[in-house]
Amino acid sequence: MRHLLSLLRSGKGLRYAPVVYADSAEFALRVVLRGLPSGPIDVSGDHCPVSMRPFVLGVRLAAKNVDQGALAPCPWLEIYPPNSETTPLARLALKSVGMLPMNQGALYLFEVARTMNRCLPRPTLWLRYLLAWQNARTAARRGDALRMSARDLRALNAYYIVARPVFLVGVGHDKREDLFPMDLVGALSSGEYLLALRATSPGVALIEASKRIAMSSAPAELLEAVYALGNRHRQPTLDLNKLTVPISSSPLFGLPVLDQAGLVRELSVERVERIGSHVLFMARIEHEAGLSGRQLAHMSGTYIEWLRRSQRGCEVLAPL
């Protein structure tokens, strides 16, 4: 009862958990865009969140899939569980809010009008939704600067059924450096790369000035140290010598990366767009080496519960 009262006060009903990202069936979900005149399109390798307030998804579509002006008025995104072609775990009804041309195709921007989540029994899910509404209602009082709406919190939780790998992003310009964790990143099937960084982040100015980014995969074993970097991210610059994790320089740009990181990726920024609460960096990969290994990722708690009820599982690093 005490736990329930605590939940009701804080409103934290839609939870997320850090997990170990793995090459396994539990992470091999399919994401399908439906409602287009050309028929359903598998966009599993072509989507990324680009804003949190409002919650906006970017979906890359090839020119052959969308004729100019032919985008359906009410498309929807479906997330399918491993080895299933029939019933989606979640369905997000989309509302088109824009389009950004890319080197290959275009990035279509969508807000989420409605969310259906099948990971939990309906009574349990509606209790979680009630708590999410309470969380949104008290956001200003709690000092939550992002203040996502209850609708967007529901959409975000369903979208994170597809785990988001975490990277340490290294940036620098004019003797200022920063290193911070991000999961709003996405490698597209076209070879292009997206990163969405909160507009208030000091890292935005550094990236805009240098047009360069270095990324290293965040090891699951360094969970606490990775989150500590996130807590220090508001500082104007970061003293890399005082960090508790070993840091080295990326081979191409000389930007800070995790020493002996499994994967190091270096990007050149080609375009910058401000979308809602975030700044979207559209980039190309200049250099990549290594493998991710046991990488930290974030996953929806509702999907973790679904896996457990289905006698499946993944390595969860913190209690739900």
Where in the sequence are the language-model features?
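Basic, polyanion-binding surface patches
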Residues: 1-320
